[in-house]
Amino acid sequence: MKGILGKKVGMTRVFKDDKAIPVTVIKAGPCVVVQKKTVETDGYNAIQIGFEEIPERKANKPLMGHFKKAQVKPLRYLREFRVENVDDYEIGQKIDVTIFSEGEKIDLIGNSKGRGYSGVMKRWNFRGGENTHGSKFHRGLGSTGMATFPSKVFKGKKMPGQYGNERVTIQNSEVVYIDVQNNLIAVKGGVPGARGGLVTIREAVKAKRPKTK
């Protein structure tokens, strides 16, 4: 499975065939292959790639040993991607946006914006209660566990709490255009997270592929 890491730049729009298409621009790569994992040593085939160089003082000793073994500069982010054949990659090899093409379907993984402690109307779209006619119930969640039966709160009950800052995957997004010179990739629609947030881009897992006879 091919993939790359990037950072969300922001949203804009492009025009194709007299249609305005909302796109999110991501600065993707270049990433560096830091480690290769094989079935013999690790039980599966994968490559570990790194993104965004950092000064040595910002990497701890175990990570510095990991980077020195691969003979690469310290990197802020490390992620794994399963591959069929690790021999197609070399330690220190650079991976850029050219692994994707315009019109291709991809999956985007990021952390959604954190919105803090939120009530049920904002977090779960509860309707709420009456605002007039003597009602004292406005934005509350209502009954949580009843009294005699079941006399408990069921697991998974929608209640107030931390909203956002969760791993979100957007599937089957379309690559609208690629700027190889500036390492930019524009995808149709929105991407989870704030500007500057880390985004993992991989080939679509559930993309429709032509049937083979």
Swiss-Prot record:
Subunit architecture: Part of the 50S ribosomal subunit. Forms a cluster with proteins L14 and L19.
Its biological purpose is as follows: One of the primary rRNA binding proteins, it binds directly near the 3'-end of the 23S rRNA, where it nucleates assembly of the 50S subunit.
Is RNA-binding included in the keywords of this UniProt record? yes
Q: Which HAMAP family match?
A: Ribosomal_uL3_B (MF_01325_B)
A GO cellular component entry from the record: cytosolic large ribosomal subunit
Keyword RNA-binding set for record: yes
Q: What is this protein called?
A: Large ribosomal subunit protein uL3
Q: Which family does it belong to?
A: Belongs to the universal ribosomal protein uL3 family.
